[in-house]
Amino acid sequence: MKDEFITRVGVWGQRHYAYLKKHSPTVINVMRMKGTLEQYLKDIDKDAKDMFDKLVKQLSDSEGINEELKSANEIDWIRSMNSIRNRAEEIVLSEVIYN
């Protein structure tokens, strides 16, 4: 069965869907039959996005990565923000998407 709504679910919801499809196809089938799969994935997507944004903010604040650094040394700011985003993504993946 093709889940055509998947394009309307954000990237985090799509990642969780792919994980469930591979590791828990029965869960997907039950939610399909109940008609709850799309909303479930949208909720996962929102929770993961909120967590990601919060983590990026917390990590950048705690490490002093701010607009002043961006003005003074843009390359260091980009490098630091990429590192922060990568760490936040790993946390969200392990705690929300692959859980």
Where are these regions (language model features)?
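Extended, charged helical/alpha-beta scaffold domains that provide interaction surfaces
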Residues: 1-99
